[in-house]
Protein backbone atom coordinates (compact mmCIF):
# COMPACT_ATOMS: atom_id res chain seq x y z
CA UNK A 1 0.00 0.00 0.00
CA UNK A 2 1.32 3.45 -0.95
CA UNK A 3 2.46 5.60 1.94
CA UNK A 4 0.92 9.05 2.04
CA UNK A 5 3.23 12.05 2.41
CA UNK A 6 2.15 15.66 2.84
CA UNK A 7 4.85 18.10 1.76
CA UNK A 8 5.10 21.55 3.29
CA UNK A 9 5.18 23.66 0.11
CA UNK A 10 6.37 27.21 0.63
CA UNK A 11 6.39 28.31 -2.98
CA UNK A 12 10.17 27.88 -3.12
CA UNK A 13 12.30 25.63 -5.29
CA UNK A 14 13.44 23.28 -2.49
CA UNK A 15 9.95 22.20 -1.39
CA UNK A 16 8.82 22.05 -5.03
CA UNK A 17 11.58 19.60 -5.93
CA UNK A 18 10.95 17.67 -2.69
CA UNK A 19 7.37 16.99 -3.79
CA UNK A 20 8.49 15.94 -7.27
CA UNK A 21 11.17 13.59 -5.93
CA UNK A 22 8.73 11.90 -3.55
CA UNK A 23 6.35 11.26 -6.45
CA UNK A 24 9.21 9.66 -8.38
CA UNK A 25 9.97 7.49 -5.33
CA UNK A 26 6.45 6.07 -5.40
CA UNK A 27 4.76 7.88 -2.52
CA UNK A 28 1.21 9.20 -2.61
CA UNK A 29 2.01 12.92 -2.39
CA UNK A 30 -0.07 15.96 -1.46
CA UNK A 31 1.12 19.48 -0.69
CA UNK A 32 0.23 21.87 2.10
CA UNK A 33 0.83 25.63 2.05
CA UNK A 34 1.05 27.18 5.51
CA UNK A 35 0.00 30.74 6.16
CA UNK A 36 1.79 31.76 9.35
CA UNK A 37 1.41 35.53 9.27
CA UNK A 38 -1.56 37.83 8.70
CA UNK A 39 -0.48 40.78 6.61
CA UNK A 40 -1.43 43.77 8.69
CA UNK A 41 0.19 46.68 6.95
CA UNK A 42 -0.52 46.44 3.25
CA UNK A 43 3.15 46.85 2.36
CA UNK A 44 4.59 45.53 -0.85
CA UNK A 45 6.96 43.27 1.07
CA UNK A 46 4.63 40.42 1.89
CA UNK A 47 4.89 37.69 -0.70
CA UNK A 48 2.38 35.19 0.74
CA UNK A 49 -0.07 35.47 -2.18
CA UNK A 50 2.71 35.14 -4.72
CA UNK A 51 4.19 32.18 -2.84
CA UNK A 52 0.81 30.44 -2.70
CA UNK A 53 0.37 30.97 -6.45
CA UNK A 54 3.81 29.46 -7.09
CA UNK A 55 3.07 26.47 -4.84
CA UNK A 56 -0.25 25.94 -6.66
CA UNK A 57 1.45 26.17 -10.06
CA UNK A 58 3.95 23.49 -9.05
CA UNK A 59 1.22 21.27 -7.58
CA UNK A 60 -0.76 21.57 -10.81
CA UNK A 61 2.33 20.83 -12.91
CA UNK A 62 3.23 17.62 -11.09
CA UNK A 63 -0.40 16.62 -10.57
CA UNK A 64 -0.90 16.72 -6.81
CA UNK A 65 -3.50 18.28 -4.54
CA UNK A 66 -2.49 21.38 -2.56
CA UNK A 67 -4.06 21.98 0.86
CA UNK A 68 -3.80 25.28 2.72
CA UNK A 69 -3.72 25.81 6.47
CA UNK A 70 -3.68 28.98 8.55
CA UNK A 71 -1.37 28.78 11.56
CA UNK A 72 -1.21 32.54 12.15
CA UNK A 73 -2.75 32.31 15.62
CA UNK A 74 -0.36 29.53 16.69
CA UNK A 75 2.52 31.52 15.23
CA UNK A 76 1.61 34.65 17.16
CA UNK A 77 1.18 32.75 20.45
CA UNK A 78 4.12 30.36 20.22
CA UNK A 79 6.72 32.32 18.22
CA UNK A 80 6.08 36.02 17.75
CA UNK A 81 5.28 36.99 21.34
CA UNK A 82 8.51 35.28 22.47
CA UNK A 83 10.40 37.10 19.70
CA UNK A 84 9.15 40.49 20.94
CA UNK A 85 9.85 39.65 24.60
CA UNK A 86 13.44 38.71 23.78
CA UNK A 87 14.07 41.95 21.88
CA UNK A 88 12.46 43.95 24.67
CA UNK A 89 14.92 42.29 27.10
CA UNK A 90 17.90 43.35 24.98
CA UNK A 91 18.61 39.94 23.47
CA UNK A 92 18.76 38.93 19.79
CA UNK A 93 16.42 35.95 19.18
CA UNK A 94 16.27 33.61 16.20
CA UNK A 95 12.55 33.17 15.43
CA UNK A 96 13.16 30.74 12.57
CA UNK A 97 14.36 28.11 15.07
CA UNK A 98 11.22 28.47 17.19
CA UNK A 99 9.07 28.56 14.04
CA UNK A 100 10.50 25.21 12.93
CA UNK A 101 9.96 23.68 16.37
CA UNK A 102 6.44 24.96 17.01
CA UNK A 103 4.90 25.50 13.55
CA UNK A 104 6.70 23.94 10.57
CA UNK A 105 6.98 20.59 12.32
CA UNK A 106 4.68 20.38 15.37
CA UNK A 107 1.56 22.22 14.14
CA UNK A 108 2.10 21.02 10.56
CA UNK A 109 2.60 17.40 11.62
CA UNK A 110 -0.50 17.46 13.85
CA UNK A 111 -2.55 18.88 10.96
CA UNK A 112 -1.11 16.42 8.43
CA UNK A 113 -2.04 13.49 10.66
CA UNK A 114 -5.68 14.64 10.58
CA UNK A 115 -5.40 14.46 6.77
CA UNK A 116 -4.27 10.84 6.98
CA UNK A 117 -0.55 11.33 6.38
CA UNK A 118 2.02 8.64 7.15
CA UNK A 119 4.81 11.22 6.89
CA UNK A 120 5.36 14.90 6.34
CA UNK A 121 8.19 16.24 4.18
CA UNK A 122 9.94 19.59 3.92
CA UNK A 123 12.50 21.21 1.65
CA UNK A 124 15.14 21.55 4.37
CA UNK A 125 18.73 20.58 3.71
CA UNK A 126 19.01 17.92 6.41
CA UNK A 127 18.88 14.15 6.64
CA UNK A 128 17.55 11.62 9.13
CA UNK A 129 18.92 8.30 10.27
CA UNK A 130 16.92 5.13 10.85
CA UNK A 131 14.51 5.04 13.79
CA UNK A 132 16.24 4.65 17.16
CA UNK A 133 14.99 4.42 20.76
CA UNK A 134 16.05 6.48 23.76
CA UNK A 135 16.36 5.13 27.33
CA UNK A 136 12.63 5.72 27.91
CA UNK A 137 11.79 3.50 24.95
CA UNK A 138 10.60 6.47 22.85
CA UNK A 139 11.07 6.19 19.10
CA UNK A 140 12.97 9.01 17.43
CA UNK A 141 15.09 9.58 14.33
CA UNK A 142 18.57 11.08 14.71
CA UNK A 143 19.00 14.33 12.76
CA UNK A 144 21.94 14.37 10.33
CA UNK A 145 23.59 17.23 8.47
CA UNK A 146 22.48 17.80 4.88
CA UNK A 147 24.77 16.46 2.17
CA UNK A 148 25.37 20.00 0.86
CA UNK A 149 27.62 21.49 3.58
CA UNK A 150 27.05 24.98 2.26
CA UNK A 151 23.27 24.65 2.65
CA UNK A 152 22.99 22.40 5.72
CA UNK A 153 20.05 23.66 7.84
CA UNK A 154 20.36 21.49 10.95
CA UNK A 155 21.34 24.62 12.93
CA UNK A 156 17.74 25.81 12.45
CA UNK A 157 16.23 22.35 13.06
CA UNK A 158 18.03 21.38 16.27
CA UNK A 159 14.99 22.11 18.49
CA UNK A 160 12.67 19.80 16.54
CA UNK A 161 12.16 16.64 18.60
CA UNK A 162 13.39 13.37 17.14
CA UNK A 163 9.89 11.88 17.35
CA UNK A 164 8.84 14.52 14.79
CA UNK A 165 11.98 13.93 12.71
CA UNK A 166 10.94 10.25 12.74
CA UNK A 167 7.77 11.25 10.85
CA UNK A 168 9.59 13.57 8.42
CA UNK A 169 11.26 13.03 5.05
CA UNK A 170 13.94 15.40 3.71
CA UNK A 171 14.22 14.64 -0.02
CA UNK A 172 16.68 17.43 -0.92
CA UNK A 173 18.87 16.70 2.09
CA UNK A 174 20.53 13.99 0.03
CA UNK A 175 21.54 16.28 -2.87
CA UNK A 176 23.28 19.60 -3.47
CA UNK A 177 21.59 22.88 -4.32
CA UNK A 178 22.76 23.12 -7.96
CA UNK A 179 21.23 19.68 -8.57
CA UNK A 180 17.94 20.86 -7.01
CA UNK A 181 17.86 23.78 -9.47
CA UNK A 182 18.70 21.44 -12.35
CA UNK A 183 15.85 19.05 -11.45
CA UNK A 184 13.41 21.98 -11.19
CA UNK A 185 14.42 23.24 -14.64
CA UNK A 186 14.24 19.75 -16.13
CA UNK A 187 10.68 19.41 -14.80
CA UNK A 188 9.84 22.96 -15.94
CA UNK A 189 8.66 23.98 -12.47
CA UNK A 190 7.53 27.59 -11.97
CA UNK A 191 9.96 27.95 -9.05
CA UNK A 192 13.08 26.75 -10.91
CA UNK A 193 14.69 30.20 -11.07
CA UNK A 194 13.01 31.73 -8.01
CA UNK A 195 15.58 33.20 -5.66
CA UNK A 196 15.91 31.81 -2.15
CA UNK A 197 14.09 33.77 0.55
CA UNK A 198 16.42 35.45 3.03
CA UNK A 199 14.13 37.30 5.42
CA UNK A 200 12.76 36.13 8.75
CA UNK A 201 9.59 34.27 7.84
CA UNK A 202 7.13 36.96 8.94
CA UNK A 203 9.20 39.99 7.94
CA UNK A 204 10.11 38.89 4.44
CA UNK A 205 12.39 41.34 2.67
CA UNK A 206 11.27 44.52 4.41
CA UNK A 207 13.58 46.66 6.55
CA UNK A 208 13.94 44.98 9.92
CA UNK A 209 14.08 48.19 11.98
CA UNK A 210 10.92 49.54 10.37
CA UNK A 211 9.12 46.30 11.14
CA UNK A 212 10.27 46.09 14.75
CA UNK A 213 9.22 49.60 15.71
CA UNK A 214 5.63 48.80 14.71
CA UNK A 215 5.52 46.55 17.80
CA UNK A 216 8.13 47.83 20.25
CA UNK A 217 8.66 51.50 21.15
CA UNK A 218 12.21 52.60 20.44
CA UNK A 219 14.19 53.68 23.50
CA UNK A 220 17.10 55.88 22.39
CA UNK A 221 20.13 56.08 24.65
CA UNK A 222 23.82 56.87 24.78
CA UNK A 223 26.60 55.32 22.71
CA UNK A 224 29.79 55.01 24.77
CA UNK A 225 33.32 53.86 24.04
CA UNK A 226 34.98 50.97 25.86
CA UNK A 227 36.36 53.53 28.35
CA UNK A 228 32.89 54.93 29.11
CA UNK A 229 33.23 58.15 27.10
CA UNK A 230 29.94 59.27 25.49
CA UNK A 231 30.23 59.67 21.73
CA UNK A 232 26.68 59.66 20.39
CA UNK A 233 23.12 58.39 20.61
CA UNK A 234 21.67 55.06 19.58
CA UNK A 235 18.10 54.50 18.34
CA UNK A 236 17.29 51.63 20.72
CA UNK A 237 19.37 48.65 21.88
CA UNK A 238 17.04 46.23 20.10
CA UNK A 239 18.33 47.47 16.73
CA UNK A 240 21.91 46.35 17.40
CA UNK A 241 23.56 42.99 17.83
CA UNK A 242 26.86 41.98 19.39
CA UNK A 243 29.74 42.08 16.92
CA UNK A 244 27.76 44.21 14.46
CA UNK A 245 29.98 46.23 12.15
CA UNK A 246 28.75 49.56 10.87
CA UNK A 247 25.27 51.02 11.07
CA UNK A 248 26.24 52.66 14.35
CA UNK A 249 26.46 56.23 13.04
CA UNK A 250 30.00 57.04 14.14
CA UNK A 251 31.72 57.18 10.76
CA UNK A 252 34.23 60.02 10.60
CA UNK A 253 34.10 60.73 14.34
CA UNK A 254 36.53 63.49 15.26
CA UNK A 255 39.78 62.24 16.76
CA UNK A 256 39.10 58.57 16.00
CA UNK A 257 41.17 56.32 13.78
CA UNK A 258 39.84 55.26 10.39
CA UNK A 259 38.98 51.70 11.51
CA UNK A 260 35.50 50.20 11.54
CA UNK A 261 33.29 50.42 14.63
CA UNK A 262 31.83 47.32 16.28
CA UNK A 263 29.13 46.73 18.88
CA UNK A 264 31.00 45.34 21.90
CA UNK A 265 28.39 45.20 24.66
CA UNK A 266 24.76 46.10 25.37
CA UNK A 267 24.40 47.68 28.82
CA UNK A 268 20.68 46.96 29.15
CA UNK A 269 20.36 48.24 32.72
CA UNK A 270 21.57 51.71 31.71
CA UNK A 271 20.38 51.60 28.07
CA UNK A 272 23.91 52.19 26.77
CA UNK A 273 25.52 50.79 23.64
CA UNK A 274 29.23 50.10 24.10
CA UNK A 275 31.27 50.32 20.89
CA UNK A 276 34.92 50.11 19.92
CA UNK A 277 37.35 49.48 17.11
CA UNK A 278 39.02 46.19 16.31
CA UNK A 279 37.39 43.11 14.81
CA UNK A 280 38.68 40.94 17.67
CA UNK A 281 38.26 43.41 20.51
CA UNK A 282 38.75 41.73 23.95
CA UNK A 283 35.23 42.71 25.10
CA UNK A 284 33.80 40.45 22.37
CA UNK A 285 35.83 37.38 23.34
CA UNK A 286 34.50 34.54 25.47
CA UNK A 287 35.50 30.96 26.24
CA UNK A 288 32.33 29.82 28.03
CA UNK A 289 28.58 30.16 27.60
CA UNK A 290 25.53 29.08 29.56
CA UNK A 291 22.18 27.88 28.24
CA UNK A 292 19.25 27.35 30.61
CA UNK A 293 17.29 24.80 28.58
CA UNK A 294 18.49 22.38 25.91
CA UNK A 295 16.36 20.64 23.29
CA UNK A 296 18.03 17.27 22.67
CA UNK A 297 16.87 15.62 19.44
CA UNK A 298 16.76 12.24 21.21
CA UNK A 299 14.77 13.72 24.09
CA UNK A 300 17.77 13.18 26.38
CA UNK A 301 21.56 13.26 26.38
CA UNK A 302 24.00 11.61 28.76
CA UNK A 303 26.53 14.17 29.99
CA UNK A 304 29.26 12.52 32.10
CA UNK A 305 30.86 14.31 35.05
CA UNK A 306 33.98 15.00 32.97
CA UNK A 307 31.80 16.63 30.31
CA UNK A 308 30.60 15.72 26.83
CA UNK A 309 33.16 16.28 24.07
CA UNK A 310 31.56 17.48 20.85
CA UNK A 311 31.57 20.44 18.47
CA UNK A 312 29.23 23.42 18.45
CA UNK A 313 28.06 26.34 16.36
CA UNK A 314 26.84 29.62 17.88
CA UNK A 315 25.66 30.98 14.53
CA UNK A 316 24.58 29.59 11.17
CA UNK A 317 27.39 28.48 8.84
CA UNK A 318 30.05 28.94 11.50
CA UNK A 319 32.77 26.25 11.23
CA UNK A 320 32.41 23.65 13.98
CA UNK A 321 34.07 24.70 17.25
CA UNK A 322 35.52 22.04 19.57
CA UNK A 323 34.04 22.19 23.06
CA UNK A 324 33.08 20.35 26.24
CA UNK A 325 29.52 20.45 27.57
CA UNK A 326 28.89 20.23 31.32
CA UNK A 327 25.68 20.07 33.34
CA UNK A 328 25.09 23.48 34.93
CA UNK A 329 24.57 22.82 38.62
CA UNK A 330 22.83 26.20 39.02
CA UNK A 331 20.08 25.43 36.50
CA UNK A 332 17.49 22.65 36.39
CA UNK A 333 17.94 21.82 32.69
CA UNK A 334 20.88 24.00 31.69
CA UNK A 335 24.42 23.42 30.51
CA UNK A 336 27.75 25.22 30.59
CA UNK A 337 29.88 25.03 27.46
CA UNK A 338 33.67 25.42 27.50
CA UNK A 339 35.27 26.08 24.12
CA UNK A 340 38.81 24.97 23.27
CA UNK A 341 39.45 28.35 21.59
CA UNK A 342 38.13 31.86 22.38
CA UNK A 343 34.91 32.71 20.53
CA UNK A 344 34.00 36.09 19.03
CA UNK A 345 30.67 37.85 19.59
CA UNK A 346 28.70 34.95 21.07
CA UNK A 347 25.26 36.54 21.34
CA UNK A 348 22.67 35.97 24.09
CA UNK A 349 19.33 35.06 22.51
CA UNK A 350 20.96 33.19 19.63
CA UNK A 351 21.39 29.42 19.79
CA UNK A 352 24.28 27.08 20.48
CA UNK A 353 23.91 23.83 18.53
CA UNK A 354 25.88 20.65 19.26
CA UNK A 355 27.21 18.04 16.84
CA UNK A 356 28.90 14.66 16.99
CA UNK A 357 30.37 14.26 13.50
CA UNK A 358 27.34 14.15 11.15
CA UNK A 359 24.74 13.94 13.94
CA UNK A 360 23.04 17.08 15.26
CA UNK A 361 22.56 16.36 18.97
CA UNK A 362 20.41 19.40 19.78
CA UNK A 363 20.99 22.83 21.27
CA UNK A 364 19.56 25.72 23.22
CA UNK A 365 19.29 29.48 23.53
CA UNK A 366 22.42 31.23 24.80
CA UNK A 367 21.68 32.94 28.12
CA UNK A 368 25.05 34.55 28.87
CA UNK A 369 28.81 34.17 28.34
CA UNK A 370 31.99 34.93 30.24
CA UNK A 371 32.93 37.80 27.93
CA UNK A 372 34.38 40.61 30.09
CA UNK A 373 32.06 43.40 31.22
CA UNK A 374 33.37 46.94 30.57
CA UNK A 375 35.02 48.17 33.78
CA UNK A 376 32.87 51.32 33.97
CA UNK A 377 29.62 49.31 34.25
UniProtKB/Swiss-Prot annotation:
It comes from the Bacteria. One of its GO terms (cellular component) is cytoplasm. It holds the Pfam family tRNA_Me_trans_C. It catalyses: S-sulfanyl-L-cysteinyl-[protein] + uridine(34) in tRNA + AH2 + ATP = 2-thiouridine(34) in tRNA + L-cysteinyl-[protein] + A + AMP + diphosphate + H(+). The active site is at residues 99, 201. Its EC number is 2.8.1.13. It is found in: Cytoplasm. One of its GO terms (molecular function) is tRNA binding. Its main location: cytoplasm. Keywords: ATP-binding, Cytoplasm, Disulfide bond, Nucleotide-binding, RNA-binding, Transferase, tRNA processing, tRNA-binding. HAMAP family: tRNA_thiouridyl_MnmA. This is tRNA-specific 2-thiouridylase MnmA. The lineage of its organism: Bacteria, Pseudomonadati, Pseudomonadota, Gammaproteobacteria, Moraxellales.
Amino acid sequence: MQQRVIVGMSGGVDSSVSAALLLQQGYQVEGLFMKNWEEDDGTEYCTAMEDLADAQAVADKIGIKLHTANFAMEYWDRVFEHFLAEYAAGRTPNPDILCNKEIKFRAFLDHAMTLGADFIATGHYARRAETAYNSKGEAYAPLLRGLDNNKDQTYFLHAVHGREINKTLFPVGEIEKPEVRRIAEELDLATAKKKDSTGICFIGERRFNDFLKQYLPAQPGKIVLDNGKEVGEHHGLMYYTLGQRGGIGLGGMKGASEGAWFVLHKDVANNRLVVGQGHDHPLMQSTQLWSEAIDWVAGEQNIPAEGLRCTAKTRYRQPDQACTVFIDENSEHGVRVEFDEPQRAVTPGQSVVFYSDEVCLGGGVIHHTNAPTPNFI
